[in-house]
A protein has these predicted regions:
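Structural register within alpha-helical repeat arrays
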Residues: 37-41, 73, 104, 110-111, ...
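Short coil/linker segments at helix-helix boundaries
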Residues: 1-3, 147-175, 198-205
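Terminal, low-structured helical/coil segments at or just beyond the last alpha-helical repeat
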Residues: 175-211
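Short coil/turn linking the two alpha-helices of tandem helical-hairpin repeats
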Residues: 46, 98-101, 113-119, 146, ...
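Solenoid-like repeat scaffolds
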Residues: 22-28, 57-66, 92-101, 130-135
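Generic helix N-cap/helix-start motif at coil->alpha-helix transitions
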Residues: 1-4, 11-17, 25-38, 49-53, ...
Length: 211
């Protein structure tokens, strides 16, 4: 019964909860109140890297008129490694809803991160630029922008051209450093990726001034 389940779930681990609700889910897919209860339990227990949670969210986002479950679904797809599906849901949210500015900026950044994992680096950068147009001094956006450049470095031309991408990345990390919330991470990233800069001799033979 529901009362027994309510007594059990606070002490249950993720595996136990999935085991308890998986069969019930198969028989109760049209019971929206039941699905919302499962979603709440799994979310509160941080038990989101599993197929049950994805299945529950997939149904709820179809029947709920708000974007709440769609955002949860996109984030959960990302957490489970389904980056293309995650990108598609984030894209749909941005197209279909007039989001409040902070939420829109965060959704753009999450969309950019999904695109990064798909190796769609130029598209990912475009989304970070849109996020920064909303929040110009947002260190987290500059951090992600830098990490996108790092991720895509190996796909840029010859060895020299690949190393020059780290100039762009570190420039982003320097901008991120101005935001106290991410300052420590930004400084570590600067120290890590500055080591990959091309040396002066390499720059000279490639007709580029280091700076």
């Amino acid at each position: 019964s529901e009362k027994i389940e309510d007594m059990f779930t606070p002490y249950a681990n993720c595996e136990d909860i999935i085991s308890l609700y998986s069969e019930k889910f198969q028989n109760s897919k049209e019971d929206i109140d039941f699905l919302k209860r499962i979603e709440k339990i799994l979310n509160e227990k941080e038990c989101v890297k599993n197929q049950l949670y994805l299945d529950v969210l997939s149904i709820l986002q179809d029947v709920d008129e708000s974007y709440d479950y769609e955002i949860k679904l996109a984030s959960t797809l990302f957490a489970n490694g389904y980056f293309l599906k995650s990108s598609n849901v984030f894209k749909k949210i941005l197209q279909n809803y007039d989001l409040e500015e902070n939420l829109k900026a965060k959704t753009l950044l999450d969309y950019a991160n999904s695109l990064r994992m798909e190796k769609k680096y130029s598209q990912a950068i475009s989304q970070t630029i849109k996020a920064l147009q909303i929040k110009p001094d947002w260190g987290e956006a500059y951090l992600l922008q830098g990490n996108i450049y790092v991720s895509g470095a190996k796909s840029c031309g010859n060895d020299f051209e690949q190393t020059t991408v780290y100039w762009l990345a570190v420039d982003c990390f320097v901008k991120a450093k101005s935001d106290d919330k991410v300052k420590d991470i930004a400084v570590k990233s600067i120290n890590t990726y500055s080591k990959y800069f091309p040396n002066k001799e390499t720059c000279f033979f490639n007709g580029v001034q280091s700076g």
